[in-house]
């Protein structure tokens, strides 16, 4: 990936890491079969630490304007990546004293608005568990 990747580059990188055997395990674990709670969810077969490594490498400079493309992905892990980028950015702002920092307040509000706009894309318990307490719980 480039130093400042686009959403498409992040998706392409994550797709290049696909693991078919792990994909099958995840699809069973997250109940993606007909009539199950995760019906239709698609997986690349990446483990959460792999996704967190991607987030760690891109989150600092990743533009919020690129996050919706990640959140709209058919891939579960790519949506998780988008959510964790929002969490990372939000947590960084949450550590600041916001009383007199209008820019930080606006940034935090922008992240919250974006999260709520795409909340339906957090469509499985793990996506909710890893993002809601960190953003909406503050």
Regions found by a protein language model. Name each.
Residues 1-138:
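Alpha-helical scaffold domains
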């Amino acid at each position: 990936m480039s130093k400042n990747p686009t959403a498409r580059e992040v998706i392409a990188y994550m797709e290049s890491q696909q693991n078919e055997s792990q994909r099958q395990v995840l699809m069973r674990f997250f109940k993606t079969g007909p009539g199950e709670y995760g019906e239709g969810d698609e997986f690349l077969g990446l483990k959460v630490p792999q996704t967190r490594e991607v987030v760690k490498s891109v989150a600092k400079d990743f533009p919020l304007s690129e996050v919706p493309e990640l959140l709209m992905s058919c891939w579960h892990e790519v949506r998780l990546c988008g959510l964790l980028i929002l969490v990372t950015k939000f947590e960084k702002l949450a550590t600041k004293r916001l009383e007199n920092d209008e820019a930080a307040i606006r940034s935090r509000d922008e992240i919250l608005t974006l999260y709520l706009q795409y909340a339906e894309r957090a469509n499985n318990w793990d996506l909710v568990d890893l993002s809601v307490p960190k953003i909406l719980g503050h």
